[in-house]
A protein has these predicted regions:
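Active-site-proximal catalytic alpha-helix in oxidoreductases
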Residues: 155, 192-247
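Interdomain hinge/lid region at the active-site interface
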Residues: 225-306
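NAD(P)+-binding Rossmann beta1-loop-alpha1 motif at the extreme N-terminus of oxidoreductases
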Residues: 1-55, 59-60, 80
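ADP-ribose/adenylate-binding Rossmann-like module
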Residues: 106-124
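A short helix->loop->beta-strand "cap" motif at the edges of active sites that frequently abuts
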Residues: 23, 109-112, 134-136
């Protein structure tokens, strides 16, 4: 697993791959050393866990400084060699996939499996297929969740096939994830990327814009801490998610805003905000209600029902009563 000294790579190494009953050995590979915190995360894994440092040179990717990491099964299986790996997982940032593929430089066995975990699929998978080498099966994966909890049960992973796989790799991924209680979703690269522009790129941008607007609105001695005391359930929910985003990997979020189509999807969001702001400023209360009615119609009754249930579950989890939300009352 390349790029597995921390983040999603480390989490999935421990709670996905090391939990599979047909995986005996997981090798963590990274340019960064394995921290004490990472060693704690990976401890007591069912599979043998090893760490090897990655070095890049004009000759490609080399594996150095190998060590066995304490785990429930710590029997050494010998020095790891890239040419003998059954499965190679790219858990590196989107911007680094090209560098890693150049480093692999034909080192993979002709029957090896290769997957990635990036949040964009079309361009990375095309690059992987091009450079993986003859006979290598390539499939894309995208864990659609954050790094929380100690189990993959109930979490969703998107699986994206390529023409290099005869179905064996994607069936293995699908079967293993389902045995662990995860939810899988098979989707084309193009459809995945289109939906992620909305579900991820636009959503992140909206949260960043919300955080920027909130902090820009504070005056004098006003503070976020005091504002939170006045927080309605929607504000607390959006504020919490925005705050969480700001504590995560800023490089990752920056790369998501630079993916193909990101500029256009931000423009769609900005145009909608500007149109609604103009409509609300120039229209009557009835006009605003018409806008809301139209938006509700576009969502549809079924989606609104699901959204209401999910939001109420979220409010309860945050110990906030949705009935406490403030409404404008006609005085």
């Amino acid at each position: 697993m390349i790029g597995a000294a921390g983040g999603m790579g480390l989490w999935t190494a421990r709670h996905w791959f090391a939990e599979l009953d047909d995986v005996a050995r997981v090798t963590l590979c990274d340019v960064e050393p394995l921290s004490d915190k990472a060693r704690d995360v990976i401890s007591n894994a069912p599979a043998s866990i090893e760490y090897v440092r990655a070095e890049y040179s004009t000759f490609g990717l080399s594996l150095v400084d190998w060590e066995t990491v304490d785990s429930a099964s710590n029997a050494s299986l010998g020095w790891p060699e890239m040419s003998k790996m059954d499965l190679v997982v790219l858990a590196v940032p989107l911007s680094e996939i090209g560098t890693v593929m150049d480093g692999l430089n034909g080192q993979l066995a002709t029957d090896a499996w290769l997957i990635d975990m990036s949040s964009v699929k079309t361009a990375p998978l095309a690059n992987m297929v091009k450079l993986a080498g003859p006979g290598v099966a390539v499939v894309g994966t995208h864990p659609l969740f954050g790094i929380t909890g100690n189990s993959i049960t109930g979490k969703t992973v998107a699986l994206v096939p390529t023409q290099t796989d005869d179905g064996s790799l994607i069936r293995w991924l699908d079967g293993g994830l389902q045995r662990l209680g995860a939810i899988t979703m098979n989707v084309t690269a193009e459809r995945h990327d289109r939906y992620m522009l909305i579900a991820q790129t636009m959503t992140h941008f909206a949260l960043m814009a919300f955080g920027d607007a909130v902090t820009s609105s504070l005056q004098g001695d006003e503070s976020l801490e005091e504002l939170r005391q006045f927080g309605t359930p929607p504000y607390l929910a959006m504020g919490a998610v925005t705050g969480r985003l700001l504590t995560q990997n800023h490089g990752l979020y920056a790369s998501i805003q630079h993916t193909q189509g990101a500029k256009n999807i931000r423009e769609v969001f900005a145009e909608s905000a500007q149109r609604l702001a103009k409509s609300f400023a120039e229209g009557s209360l009835d006009d605003i209600e018409v806008e809301l009615d139209g938006l509700a119609d576009r969502y549809g009754a079924a989606e609104l029902s699901i959204s209401t249930r999910l939001s109420e579950e979220m409010f309860r989890a945050g110990r906030v009563d949705p009935e406490d939300d403030l409404e404008l009352m006609d005085s």
